[in-house]
Swiss-Prot record:
Highest taxon of the lineage: Bacteria
Organism: Aliivibrio fischeri (strain ATCC 700601 / ES114)
InterPro entries for this protein: UPF0178
Protein name, entry field: UPF0178 protein VF_0601
Family: Belongs to the UPF0178 family.
NCBIfam families in alphabetical order: PRK00124.1
CDD domains: PIN_YqxD-like
Amino acid sequence: MQIWVDADACPKVVKEVLFRAATRTGIQLTLVANHYIPVPSAANIRSMQVEAGFDVADDEIVKRSEAGDLVISADIPLAAELIEKKVQVLNPRGELYTEATIKARLNIRDFMDTMRASGIQTGGPAPLSQTERREFANQLDRILAKAKI
């Protein structure tokens, strides 16, 4: 198992949790983004810069990830594609997407896109709360413990 991060929009606090977990466990952690992302100096932590462009980082994660890996992303279509590959997907708020929940998430996303396209202001997501940060860290620990890392 290794961890892939859709790092273009990943909150700094989530990256810090991931850096600590990778340092503690030795698991391979790769942050994928279309710009340089600084990472701690460690053999198991790296940053991968891809070309700028729509979904280029997402496509790289789909290409490189394997069944059993963990991807950190809030991107619902990316999560749906990864779940089909049997890759686990955890969003930065601590929600683990599953086959059972991803279809509903896609429907909500599509509905919100339709509302925005019709001119209705929907706003963006709220900043991460302390509870969500804690839930992310706890869920990550559960996943790593289950994988015995």
